[in-house]
């Protein structure tokens, strides 16, 4: 390790120990190197003994900086690895840091515009940031060409070296973890860190965020449910994003929403509808829908509309995943646990040799107590969590797209019940899921699929005779190759058989001739002839094996 990495490692260890996070590892599970290391750092005591462990972990990550804050946010979605007391605290991590100098932001913008002065593109640039986070910060301005109000999101100039340095250190720590902790290998730390690095580097590319926002805006064009601000692509760069400025009420400000006369029940139900529409209709969902990224339009409070921003993280499901997920939800709420177990096996989420009866019993044991609550109080997100945790015992592989989905679903549920505590999520979602499933099966679905594929087959139709002829010719050539290979194999086997026969004869002649030669006092041509014949047989047999 380099001196700078050692200094950073020491500062990380100092923060972790000052919050007593060595308690995360039970003493009986500590390996010898960790026990020795802890004793050598005796001057770093736990200074926050009165705080719960989850809160201490959250505060420590916040103190360590942006890379660790975002890592904690990502790990908050892995509720299959952490108990609720820790996962809930990780979900509260706030990605807020001190803003950097607005003059430096201006320099970054002009650098992204290849040296063109900012005034040539924008008017009324506000040097004071509107918002600031660990990766980027936002400034307001107007487009010079149209006068429209915009916001400019610019990447922090000093963030990339920090990320690279901390990621190198994380990778080293991930390599040590399997040797230091008994369960380190099961947690797959290398894969976790690699996944995190990819997510973080994706967030540094604002062109990716711009493309996501454009797609989401297209999906909900003219929709009364969701509005996505316009992206001005001509001005966007990898380190700079320019979008329409919006005005709305933060979704977490319930008092302001009520004061504006918002229909809270309809607003909560629309949040659920927006989510399921993104997942099942569009196969493209905003996967970072925490309250800081959601606003409500001031207009038409009786017909409220969501406004979504910050599309840096999105998720998608393929057609099979969507079908299995919808059928899983319906089977679960119908208490058809056999169906739930079979769906997990059929989808490939668990190994095909899984004992379905045992799996069904495990699901029933975990999920049946959930129905002691009224349906309106049952959480979709926790249903998924319970199913995934049970499936992990049956060697379910982690499905990244489903982890993102579960995290987003928990966000949506939390927001919906904050807006309208009596929200019946199942009552809102069931008609949507049943309608979607009906569209996927039966004759209408077959005709629709044929209609969708018709242009493709119409284009390929003239090529079919030629493709058929090529197929027959290739089949003939393949048959000839197989016949030739079979002939060569038979010939080789025959040669090997003859070779083994000659080698055996040669060995017999050599041994017999040698014994005769030893037993006879006088020289005799017979033993010599036998030995010579044996040598000749060996040579011929050896040549046939080549």
UniProtKB/Swiss-Prot annotation:
What positions constitute the catalytic site? 288 (proton acceptor)
Q: Where is the Protein kinase domain?
A: 124-502
Q: Give, as one word, the top-level EC class.
A: transferase
Which InterPro entries does the protein's record reference? ABC1_dom, Kinase-like_dom_sf, UbiB, UbiB_bact, UbiB_kinase
What biological-process terms (Gene Ontology) are attached? regulation of ubiquinone biosynthetic process; ubiquinone biosynthetic process
> A single Gene Ontology molecular function, please?
protein kinase activity
> Can you tell me which residues bind ATP?
130-138, 153
Could you tell me the EC number(s) of this protein?
2.7.-.-
Q: In which pathway does it act?
A: Cofactor biosynthesis; ubiquinone biosynthesis [regulation]
Recite the UniProt keywords alphabetically. Answer: ATP-binding, Cell inner membrane, Cell membrane, Kinase, Membrane, Nucleotide-binding, Transferase, Transmembrane, Transmembrane helix, Ubiquinone biosynthesis
The entry's cellular-component GO terms read: plasma membrane
Spell out the NCBIfam families in the cross-references: PRK04750.1, UbiB
Q: Which family does it belong to?
A: Belongs to the ABC1 family. UbiB subfamily.
- Functional description taken from the UniProt entry: Is probably a protein kinase regulator of UbiI activity which is involved in aerobic coenzyme Q (ubiquinone) biosynthesis.
Q: What is this protein called?
A: Probable protein kinase UbiB
Q: Which organism is it from?
A: Pectobacterium atrosepticum (strain SCRI 1043 / ATCC BAA-672) (Erwinia carotovora subsp. atroseptica)
């Amino acid at each position: 390790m380099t001196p700078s990495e050692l200094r950073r490692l020491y500062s990380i260890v100092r923060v972790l120990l000052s919050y007593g996070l060595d308690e995360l590892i039970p003493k009986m599970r500590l390996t010898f190197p960790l026990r020795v290391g802890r004793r050598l750092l005796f001057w770093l005591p736990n200074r926050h003994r009165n705080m719960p462990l989850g809160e201490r972990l959250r505060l420590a990550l916040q103190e360590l900086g942006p890379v660790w804050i975002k890592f904690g946010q990502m790990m908050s979605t892995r509720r299959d690895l952490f108990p609720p007391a820790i996962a809930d605290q990780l979900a509260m991590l706030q990605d807020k840091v001190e803003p950097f100098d607005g003059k430096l932001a201006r320099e970054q913008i002009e650098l992204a515009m290849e040296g063109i002065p900012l005034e040539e593109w924008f008017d009324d640039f506000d040097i004071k940031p509107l918002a600031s986070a660990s990766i980027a910060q936002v400034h307001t301005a107007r487009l010079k060409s149209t006068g429209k109000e915009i916001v400019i999101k610019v990447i922090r100039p000093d963030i990339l070296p920090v990320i690279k340095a901390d990621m190198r250190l994380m990778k080293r720590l991930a390599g040590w973890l399997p040797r230091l902790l008994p369960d380190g290998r099961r947690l797959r730390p290398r894969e976790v860190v690699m996944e995190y690095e990819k997510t973080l580097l994706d967030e540094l590319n604002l062109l990716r965020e711009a493309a996501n926002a454009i797609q989401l805006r297209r999906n909900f064009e003219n929709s009364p449910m969701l509005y996505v601000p316009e992206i001005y692509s001509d001005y966007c760069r990898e380190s700079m994003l320019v979008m329409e400025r919006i005005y709305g009420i933060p979704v977490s400000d319930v008092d302001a929403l009520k004061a504006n006369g918002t229909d809270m029940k309809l607003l909560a139900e629309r949040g659920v509808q927006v989510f399921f529409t993104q997942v099942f209709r569009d196969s493209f969902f905003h996967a970072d829908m925490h309250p800081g990224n959601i606003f409500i339009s001031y207009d038409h409070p009786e017909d409220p509309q969501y406004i979504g921003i910050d599309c840096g993280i999105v998720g998608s499901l393929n057609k099979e995943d969507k079908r299995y997920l919808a059928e899983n939800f319906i089977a679960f709420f119908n208490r058809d646990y056999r169906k739930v177990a079979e769906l997990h096996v059929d989808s490939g989420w668990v190994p095909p040799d899984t004992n379905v009866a045992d799996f069904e019993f495990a699901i029933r044991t975990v999920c049946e107590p959930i129905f002691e609550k009224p349906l309106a109080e049952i959480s979709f997100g926790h249903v998924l969590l319970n199913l995934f945790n049970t499936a992990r015992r049956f060697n379910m592989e982690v499905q990244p797209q489903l982890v993102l989905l579960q995290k987003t679903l928990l966000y949506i549920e939390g927001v919906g019940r904050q807006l309208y505590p009596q929200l019946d999520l199942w009552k809102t979602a069931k008609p949507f899921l049943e309608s979607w499933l009906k569209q996927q099966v039966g004759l209408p679905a077959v005709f629709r699929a044929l209609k969708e594929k018709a242009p493709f087959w119409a284009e390929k139709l003239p090529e079919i005779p030629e493709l058929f002829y090529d197929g027959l010719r290739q089949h003939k050539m393949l048959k000839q190759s197989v016949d030739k290979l079979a002939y060569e194999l038979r010939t080789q086997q025959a040669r090997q058989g003859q070779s083994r026969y000659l080698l055996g004869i040669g060995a017999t002649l050599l041994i017999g001739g040698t014994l005769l030669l030893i037993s006879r006092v006088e020289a005799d041509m017979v033993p010599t002839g036998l030995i010579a014949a044996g040598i000749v047989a060996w040579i011929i047999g050896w040549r046939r094996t080549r």
